[in-house]
Structure formats: C-alpha cells, structure tokens
C-alpha cells in the first residue's frame, strides 16, 4: 500500500451561497485520511462556513449505510481571519466519500486541506 501526502485547495468557494460545493471526493480503491483543514475569510465582513462529509459507504455503527454529517456548521469567521478545524483529529474517507464546503456569501471562503491517500 502506498501512502501519498497531498494538499487540496480552492481559492474561493462556493460558487453559490447555500449550495455546498465539492472540495474533494475520495478516488476509487483509495482510503483518504484528512489530516487538517483551514478555512479563511476573504470577504470584507464576517462570514459563516459549513463543512459536510457526504458518505453513502457501509456503516460500521448504528446504521447499515453512512449518511451526511457536519464537520462544521455555520461557524463564524471574522474578517481577515481563518479557522482551523479537526485540530489534532483525523477523519477517514472511503471511496466516493465527499467533502463539501458552503459559506454565507458566495466565493468568500478560501480552503486548504491536507490529506493522505492510501492506495
């Protein structure tokens, strides 16, 4: 198994406020570990940001199939500030799982995510 460290970034997103935009989809035959994520406000006023994990893979817990969950929900980010989520924690993505980003204002949050893909 090969372990490949990568950075996934998007200068501004989402294209439309209220419509989450895909940042990353775990490729086929790959397990991805999210190592960290930073969201930066590039707007002239405070924004709120949401990060979702969209998963339909087999569940190992209460449900037979995983569902969409929030990693961050409507968190305020002040002007010129950034917000680090998952500080010290990891999230595992299976093939087809997605990370989606939303913001209260279109194209006003910049996102950087560090990952490790295991193939």
Language-model segments: residues:
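C-terminal interaction-tip segments
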Residues: 1-32, 95-96, 102-119
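Beta-strand signatures of extracellular beta-sandwich domains
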Residues: 50-54, 112-114
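Intrinsically disordered, low-complexity Pro/Gly/Ser/Thr-rich segments with frequent PxxP/GP/PP motifs
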Residues: 57-98
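Short edge-strand/loop segments of extracellular domains
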Residues: 54-59, 118-119
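Short solvent-exposed strand-capping/beta-turn motif centered on an Asx-Ser/Thr pair
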Residues: 39-44, 104-106
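Acidic glycine-/aspartate-rich tracts in secreted/extracellular proteins
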Residues: 42-45, 56-58
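Short gly/pro-enriched beta-turn/loop segments at secondary-structure junctions
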Residues: 32-34, 46
């Amino acid at each position: 198994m090969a372990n490949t460290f990568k950075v996934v970034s998007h200068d501004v997103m989402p294209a439309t406020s209220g419509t989450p935009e895909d940042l990353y989809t775990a490729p086929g035959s790959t397990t991805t570990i999210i190592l960290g994520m930073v969201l930066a406000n590039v707007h002239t006023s405070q924004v709120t940001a949401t990060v979702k994990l969209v998963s339909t893979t087999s569940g190992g817990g209460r449900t037979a199939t995983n569902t969409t969950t929030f990693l961050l929900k409507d968190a305020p980010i002040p002007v010129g500030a950034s917000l680090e989520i998952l500080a010290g924690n990891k999230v595992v993505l299976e093939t087809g799982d997605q990370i989606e980003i939303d913001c209260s204002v279109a194209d006003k949050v910049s996102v950087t995510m560090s990952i490790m893909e295991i193939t």
